[in-house]
């Protein structure tokens, strides 16, 4: 038997990729160009297809040599990601984290998406390492090394390796809060001032001499304690410490949809969240908000009357159990606490903003279902009337009805991109079908309910005015009626059988000649026989009080000549009131 020879070159794949990267930088042997906002990047199809599912689908069955990416992709960000595909290394500034993460999610580069959490936490800082937490001021400005805290205060320590629920489980043992210049704070693990400037280090030893321990009240997932509310001299530390500001977070443009807040019951306990499923999260979060309506916060309950205290209850974050189901595919800001009214840019660079509370509502209601998430986002940005007047696409008007204009393409594309980042397998064709279906449902609801609203209004009234938000307090009447006199119209239609719809419509449309002269009170009578086998009683009341059920009507009824085998139809009589009050059939 011949002897087998085995040759193995260490890191041969990395060497080949390095050579391909050099060829790319020199523009040699590149077979595709990726155009981003007019800037072309040469690359190799095989390398891009091996790194990105997006490019794999794009190149499949397409032999073009140039492809253009959407305008939401920044060229500088794509250049960094392209270099990552060849080298496996990614270097970026702290302010570019969100942009890179969203671009990588759009391009479906799983290596960057899966390591997104580590990428957000591993940010080099002169004030932060594995044992310390960085201190930031309220304005999110980088702090100078010379800035020091007061020696009698200590910061609240948050570590990326410790989940949010563990950080919030602090027992309530003391009701009285010390003054601002009082002793330091200590939780389950005492805090002491470390050797660094103004940095609190969590140790197992006792606190510094002269510091009295103080246990913070117990809080839920939606309220991580902020010492800035208790002791004004202590600066607030957001979680996670790596990310300071998101692109566009400083500008707060208005949106069409109102802000939604979450008001949790004071007696709710942390353990209740552990056993909830995703549907219960959605019901719990929106049970008091209505349909994305602004709701005033209730009055705070005194500390003496409750055993559990929520500190900064307006700060919200995704529950830990929901994060364990969906992972880190949501907006990065949702994993840290923040004001529900804070404006978040849905996709970096898109200019489309949504409040934290609204976005959390969408995720809590959708859970792991990406199609439900798309519907919730569309319902947040577009009201039902806008959807009913639209065709569901952001490209062109409807071919069947040109009056149906497309939805705002900027908002629609941002929503699609966000949902695609949440579920990379979510195809755009499926999103278009869902958007068109929502528009169709909105038109169907409007078509079904507006005739019912019209039937309850007096004839001659524009029914669309009340639907579009106009006040229905003063309704315009027919100009032939005197406007100075108070006019009361009350009508009751009773049908023995529900199948007599034609009879009811005929009675509604029957014209009645009313004598409005100042002569004596004339009475006119109308007699009508219904051919449907059922009788219809039409009763018209004047401003006087209506008779109780069981009493005979004061109106004069004349009985028509009908056969004994068929019920007789009494007909209402309308009279002219001397004070100008009109009563008659409509």
From Swiss-Prot:
Domain BTB: 30-94
Keywords, comma-separated and alphabetical: Isopeptide bond, Nucleus, Ubl conjugation
Membrane-spanning parts: none
SMART domains per record: BEN, BTB
Biased segments, Polar residues type: 247-261, 550-572
A Pfam family assignment: BTB
GO cellular component, as recorded: chromatin; mitochondrion; nucleolus; nucleus
Residue span, BEN domain: 349-446
GO biological process: negative regulation of cell population proliferation; negative regulation of DNA-templated transcription; positive regulation of intrinsic apoptotic signaling pathway in response to DNA damage; protein homooligomerization; protein-containing complex localization
InterPro entries: BEN_domain (IPR018379), BTB/POZ_dom (IPR000210), SKP1/BTB/POZ_sf (IPR011333), ZnFinger_BTB_dom_contain (IPR050457)
Localisation per UniProt entry: Nucleus
Cross-link (Glycyl lysine isopeptide (Lys-Gly) (interchain with G-Cter in SUMO2)): 171, 215, 297, 427, 454
Main location: nucleus
MF term (GO), any: protein homodimerization activity
Region (Disordered) location: 177-196, 236-272, 542-586
Function of the molecule: Functions as a transcriptional repressor through its association with the NuRD complex. Recruits the NuRD complex to the promoter of MDM2, leading to the repression of MDM2 transcription and subsequent stability of p53/TP53.
Oligomeric and partner information: Homooligomer; mediated by the BTB domain. Interacts with the NuRD complex. Interacts (via C-terminal part) with HDAC2. Interacts (via BTB domain) with MTA1, MTA2 and MTA3.
Record PANTHER family: AGAP004733-PA, NUCLEUS ACCUMBENS-ASSOCIATED PROTEIN 2
Identification of the protein by name: Nucleus accumbens-associated protein 2
Gene: Nacc2
């Amino acid at each position: 038997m011949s002897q087998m020879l085995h040759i193995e070159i260490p890191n041969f794949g990395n060497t080949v990729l390095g050579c391909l990267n050099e060829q790319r930088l020199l523009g040699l042997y590149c077979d595709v160009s990726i155009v981003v906002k007019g800037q072309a990047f040469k690359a190799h199809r095989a390398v891009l297809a091996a790194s990105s599912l997006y490019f794999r689908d794009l190149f499949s069955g397409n032999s073009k040599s140039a492809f253009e990416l959407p305008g939401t992709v920044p060229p500088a960000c794509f250049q960094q990601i392209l270099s990552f595909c060849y080298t496996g290394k990614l270097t970026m500034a702290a302010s570019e984290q969100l942009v890179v993460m969203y671009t990588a999610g759009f391009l479906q580069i799983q290596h960057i998406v899966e390591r997104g959490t580590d990428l957000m936490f591993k940010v080099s800082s002169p004030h932060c390492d594995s044992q310390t937490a960085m201190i930031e001021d309220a304005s999110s400005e980088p702090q100078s090394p010379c800035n020091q805290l007061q020696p009698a205060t200590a910061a609240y320590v948050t570590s990326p390796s410790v989940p949010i629920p563990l950080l919030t489980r602090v027992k309530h043992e003391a009701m009285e809060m010390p003054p601002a210049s009082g002793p330091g704070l200590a939780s389950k693990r005492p805090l002491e001032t470390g050797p660094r400037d103004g940095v609190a280090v969590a140790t197992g030893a006792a606190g510094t001499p002269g510091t009295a321990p103080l246990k913070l009240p117990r809080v839920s997932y939606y309220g991580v304690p902020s010492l800035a509310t208790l002791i004004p001299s202590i600066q607030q530390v957001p979680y996670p410490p790596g990310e300071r500001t998101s692109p566009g977070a400083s500008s707060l443009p208005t949106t069409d949809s109102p802000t939604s807040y979450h008001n949790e019951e004071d007696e709710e306990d942390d353990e209740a969240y552990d056993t909830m499923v995703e549907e219960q999260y959605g019901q719990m979060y929106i049970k008091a908000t209505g349909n994305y309506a602004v709701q005033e916060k209730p009055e705070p309950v005194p500390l003496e009357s409750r055993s559990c205290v929520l500190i900064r209850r307006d700060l919200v974050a995704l529950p830990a159990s929901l994060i364990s189901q969906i992972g880190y595919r949501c907006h990065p800001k949702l994993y840290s606490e923040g004001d529900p009214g804070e404006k978040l840019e849905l996709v970096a660079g898109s200019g489309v903003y949504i409040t934290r509370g609204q976005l959390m509502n969408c995720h809590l209601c959708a859970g792991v279902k990406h199609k439900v998430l798309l519907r919730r986002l569309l319902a947040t940005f577009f009201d039902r009337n806008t959807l009913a007047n639209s065709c569901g696409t952001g490209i062109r008007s409807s071919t069947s009805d040109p009056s149906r204009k497309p939805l705002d393409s900027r908002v629609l594309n941002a929503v699609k991109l966000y949902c695609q980042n949440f579920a990379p397998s979510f195809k755009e064709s499926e999103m278009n079908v869902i958007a068109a279906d929502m528009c169709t449902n909105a038109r169907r609801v409007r078509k079904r309910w507006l005739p019912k609203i019209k039937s309850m209004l007096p004839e001659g009234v524009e029914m669309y005015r009340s639907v579009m938000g106009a006040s229905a307090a003063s309704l315009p009447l027919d100009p032939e009626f005197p406007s100075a006199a108070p006019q009361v119209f009350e009508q009751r239609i009773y049908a023995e059988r529900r199948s007599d719809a034609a009879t009811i419509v005929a009675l509604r449309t029957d014209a009645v000649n009313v004598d409005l002269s100042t002569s004596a009170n004339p009475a006119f009578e109308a007699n009508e026989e219904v051919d449907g086998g059922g009788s219809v009683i039409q009763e018209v009341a004047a401003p006087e009080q209506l008779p109780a059920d069981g009493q005979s009507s004061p109106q004069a009824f004349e009985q028509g000549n009908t056969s004994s085998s068929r019920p007789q139809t009494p007909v209402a009589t309308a009279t002219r009131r001397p004070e100008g009050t009109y009563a008659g059939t409509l």
